[in-house]
Amino acid sequence: MNHSSGTLYIVSAPSGAGKTSLVTALTKDDQQIRVSVSHTTRAMRPGEQHGVNYHFVVHEEFKALIAQGDFLEHAEVFGNFYGTSRSALQQTLDQGYDLILEIDWQGAQQVRKLMPQALSVFILPPSQEALRHRLDGRGQDSEEIIAGRMKEAVSEMVHYDEYDYVIINDDFDTALADLKAVFRSNRLLLKKQQQRHAALLKQMIG
């Protein structure tokens, strides 16, 4: 493990844009990246695991954590609450890992105020038609829910210009390569390289 601290990344997207699939593929290829496990009050979906996908808690417990100041950010989405543990986040960064927060624009605004050094990425679908097709293809939700999420997606996408990077997920492999490029280019910044290779640089140039 290197001696440089990790970078905090915010990754946001409307539901159905492919954010989760892209982040999953990214972390499989890069062992230096971790994904923050958020707390949520929503019901567990088939295939999900407590402590892996989310920390699933009841509303009363979530409100208690807010009162204790345990969340870096928290937001309400579709009637459910989501929040990010402040202490767990900092511990991961201190270990030298890059950390991804998969949060919406509301959470992103909160995080930027407290950690302005965070880099942010917004993932867009190629069109509203493609987004609706992806939502329909899930087969998990009713037409009413899909219509509501389409409306919510538009209100989410309005905030794309608040982010440092924008990736359009038309072709998955291309979008994944773009996401990898964001992480790799940041690691090559002068400050990061000076931290990572301090001993080597001192040996070469004194």
UniProtKB/Swiss-Prot annotation:
GO cellular component entries: cytosol
Pfam families: Guanylate_kin
Limits of the Guanylate kinase-like domain: 6-184
Compartments, as annotated in UniProt: Cytoplasm
GO molecular function, one term: ATP binding
Record's catalysed reaction(s): GMP + ATP = GDP + ADP
Superkingdom classification of source: Bacteria
Keyword Plastid attributed: no
EC number(s) from the headed UniProt entry: 2.7.4.8
Keywords noted in UniProt: ATP-binding, Cytoplasm, Kinase, Nucleotide-binding, Transferase
Main location class: cytoplasm
Record-listed ATP binding positions: 13-20
EC category: transferase
Similarity comment: Belongs to the guanylate kinase family.
Function text: Essential for recycling GMP and indirectly, cGMP.
Protein name as it appears in the record: Guanylate kinase
